[in-house]
Regions:
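Internal acidic/polar
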Residues: 2-6, 96-123, 154, 196-203
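Structural recognition of an alpha-helix C-terminal capping motif at a helix-to-coil junction
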Residues: 51-58, 72-84
Length: 203
């Protein structure tokens, strides 16, 4: 017997269309975390991330035909829906939302070696500065950082998500890294480099 957890997204979608609720639950559990994380990194707000995540999967349930497997895998489609929903939320509030004061900081904490509280504090402060710097980026730069650096999405899938050329993703990411280095330098928090290695600590 093949359990739904072992099936690919396309087969799980086929089963879901046929009325298999468990198949949809597997899809949700597989993609909910990354979609929530992306929405949180884009908005800085846990409440927005919760709303966006719910809206993404409600949209998928309402109309499965919106996803065309011939145009790519399910993940870029879901990220694309999340991207549009985040933009709508931010347009409604008309300002960039800072991290909620009651955010669960444990969800962002890097894993550090025990026995070095000063080093841990310095690292936390640096990552906090990096996180805040990401939130100040223009949305078209912030989204490529979230997709390519934080979610480690390929340039091709990021291009499908955003709806632009791969070259545009590369140039935006390069520009975003330059802006982040400048912002961190201005805050006296310049890392040795900004890229996937430093970003992994935020996920």
């Amino acid at each position: 017997m093949i359990y739904p957890q072992m099936l690919g997204d396309e087969e799980l979608l086929r089963l879901t269309r046929a009325g298999d609720e468990h198949a949809f639950t597997v899809l949700y559990r597989r993609h909910q975390g990354p979609i929530y994380r992306f929405a949180l990194q884009m908005s800085g707000s846990e409440s927005v991330a919760d709303d966006v995540t719910q809206e993404v999967f409600l949209a998928l349930m309402r109309d499965f035909s919106q996803f065309d497997s011939a145009r790519g895998s399910l993940a870029p489609y879901l990220y694309g829906v999340a991207r549009n929903q985040v933009r709508r939320h931010l347009e409604r509030v008309k300002f960039q939302v800072p991290l909620d004061e009651d955010s669960d900081e444990d969800s962002f904490e890097p894993i550090t070696a025990p026995g070095d509280p000063l080093g841990d504090l310095t690292l936390r402060e640096g990552l906090s500065a990096l996180r805040q710097a990401i939130l100040t980026l223009p949305l078209h730069y912030r989204e490529v950082v979230a997709l390519c650096d934080l979610e480690e999405m390929s340039y091709e899938d990021a291009a499908r998500t955003v709806g632009c050329a791969v070259g545009t993703i590369r140039s935006r990411l390069h520009r975003a890294h330059g802006l982040l280095v400048q912002k961190l330098r201005d805050a006296n928090q310049t890392p040795s480099g900004v890229g996937r290695n430093s970003m992994r600590c935020l996920t």
